[in-house]
Amino acid sequence: MSAPKYKRILLKLSGEALMGSDAYGINPQTIAAICGEIKAVADMGVEIGVVIGGGNIFRGMAGTATGMDRATADYMGMLATVMNAMALSDAFRQCGLNARVQSALNIEQVVEPYIRGKAIRYLEEGKIVIFGAGTGNPFFTTDTAAALRGSEIGAEIVLKATKVDGIYSADPKKDPSATRYDKISFNEAISKNLAVMDATAFALCRDQKLPINVFSIFKTGALKRVVCGEDEGTLVYC
């Protein structure tokens, strides 16, 4: 078995990843499979922070399209991420992993608030820390929250788990001639306006010299291969 290249990682999971083949919500088989992929990495001693999206329940931008106030819609989206974080924490429990949920919004009867020092202590104790409610502020995506939390906890890399196996020159579902990048610089990704992550997240990671790897969470063993430094997905570098 290969040794892990990274000691501490920040994993960004989209809410849509939890849906599986369903149109909405959380698919039990899918979340169990994702936990299995994460457990394989945790069992190697890697410290794992997770930022979870909420698009399987509510997406702020979708709310604004119907005339909803943007800040209100974004706060609703943040609450959706807390629901996903709780579901993920329980799924970890069922597969034998110890996890803690921290929320950027105060919901203390349900989950504990985000406290950086406590999060780092949990990681050092071998617990998985799931960060809910994004940054706690409207107008910022959960991708930006992943860049922020990754920087705060001293992660060595941000791993963005998606439905596709990397960053493409165009949407591979719409353009059959689209090609996948093995590596791409932050500046090139920003200048090409590649939609896999927003520019704010790219810029923050670039400024902190925090690399990003974009890969498919549905490709068995892909997460472990990325953590072990094998060629998987697309690496975004400084």
From Swiss-Prot:
- Which molecular function GO terms apply here? ATP binding; UMP kinase activity
- Origin: domain of life: Bacteria
The main location is cytoplasm
What keyword terms does UniProt attach to this protein? ATP-binding, Cytoplasm, Kinase, Nucleotide-binding, Pyrimidine biosynthesis, Transferase
**Gene3D superfamilies cross-referenced by the UniProt entry:** Acetylglutamate kinase-like
Q: Name one Pfam family in it.
A: AA_kinase
Identify the residues that bind UMP. 54, 74, 135-142
Write out the annotated subcellular location: Cytoplasm
Residues bound to ATP:
12-15, 55, 59, 162, 168, 171
Q: How would you summarize the oligomeric state and partners of this protein?
A: Homohexamer.
Function of this protein? Catalyzes the reversible phosphorylation of UMP to UDP.
Family of the protein in this entry: Belongs to the UMP kinase family.
Q: What is this protein called?
A: Uridylate kinase
